[in-house]
Each structure stands twice: as structure tokens, then as C-alpha cells.
């Protein structure tokens, strides 16, 4: 296995740090740094649900995603200036919401909505995966707070969830692509998994050559190893924030 342009082994994540409680005014929050990618994730609770869910005794979790104008090399116009979110933004925020909902016990959540907001401060590849991984920590901290305030009888989580990118670069399967790798990859994939190894979503796109089944299996194995490490980072951040 050859080293990558930044010296990492093919199965190595970028340095990943999650700082819990980054936004004091949020019910739960975290700043996640994955290499040079940085995303602020917040969770806010509202004591109501969408109209179509009212009276069912179930809660809801939804997500929004955005990038600061200077988060990339070229200034990105704000969605509010454009008048609507672009297609990529809509796709990513739906992915974040689906991913987090995969580990929620909606009955235990009760008739309340948790809003997850993921704002990219700096983008160097993997922003959607970093958003999912950080949003889970923000959510877990928000639920701990609600339980501590007596608003929840128990934590309505069925497990943890994290996400990581992987792909084929120069014919080699690699984990956690940064921007230079992502922009030149023959195959680009995003994998969302629970801490127990259950797949929530797999997105894989072959850019120039078809993806073989052998390479797909290799990518999933890489992702599983990466997500196992990310789960440890998540658990450490939650433990730090909830320690007496």
C-alpha cells in the first residue's frame, strides 16, 4: 500500500477532534474538526412537532446544512441572498436528517422536534460526513440536558451514528478523502453506519470507471474501521461534556 499525498496510510483518518458545548446558547452543540474541515453542529429543542405529526405521541428530528461564504477557496453566495438553497445543500441536509433519525426512538422523544443545524466554517472535503458525526454529539448532549431537566424519562437513542468518506484514488481504496483526493477520485463514496455496524446509507459514485464488487467490499471494510474510531471520538466528547 502506497502513502497518500499527505502521508497518510490508505486506511487512516485525518486527525479528528470534537469539542463539545462549543455554542453556549444551544441545547447541545459541538465543533468537529476533521483535518482542515471544520463544522459547528447545534441541536435545538422545540416543544412541538410538524402539523402532520401532531397527536401521534411521537417526536421528530430534522436538519439544516450550510456553508459560510469563505469556507471554500471561492466565496460561496449565501442561500438567503440567492433566495433558496441549492440542490447540494438540500441533498446534504436531508442526508443528515435521515442518518440521525436512524438511531432515534421517536416515542421516547415525545411530541417535540429537535433541529440540527450544521454550519461549515472551513471545507476541505467530507463536510457531510463531519456534519453527521458532529450532529450526533450535539444531539446526544441536547437529549442529556432535556433528561436532566426532567423533560425526558429516558434518553431516546437506540445507538450511535457516524459517517465517513472513502473512495478509489489512483486505483487504490482509501479512507476519509480530503478535497484534492475527492476532486480526483475514480470512485467517491460516503458511508453512514451505526456504532454497532449497521448500515444506514451508502452513497457511491463511479466518476470514470465502474466500481467493482471487490472494491465496494473493500471500501465498506475501510469505512467500518473508520467509523469504529469515530465512535470512540464521539464517546470521549460526550463523556467530557457530561462528567460531574
Q: Which sequence ranges carry the predicted segments?
A:
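Alpha-helix C-terminal capping segments
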Residues: 33-35, 137-141
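Short amphipathic alpha-helical face segments that pack within enzyme cores
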Residues: 95, 130-138
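Short, Gly/Pro- and small/polar-rich lid/capping loops
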Residues: 1-33
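Glycine-rich, charged/polar anion/phosphate-binding loops
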Residues: 16-19, 25-28, 46-49, 101-103, ...
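Short, conserved phosphate-binding/catalytic loop or strand-edge motifs used
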Residues: 110-118
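A short glycine/serine-rich beta->alpha loop
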Residues: 81-85, 118-127
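A structural signal for small-residue-enriched, beta-sheet-centric alpha/beta enzyme cores
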Residues: 87, 108-111, 126-130, 140-144, ...
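Glycine-rich, flexible beta-strand/loop modules in the N-terminal catalytic cores of phosphate-handling
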Residues: 22, 30-109, 199-221
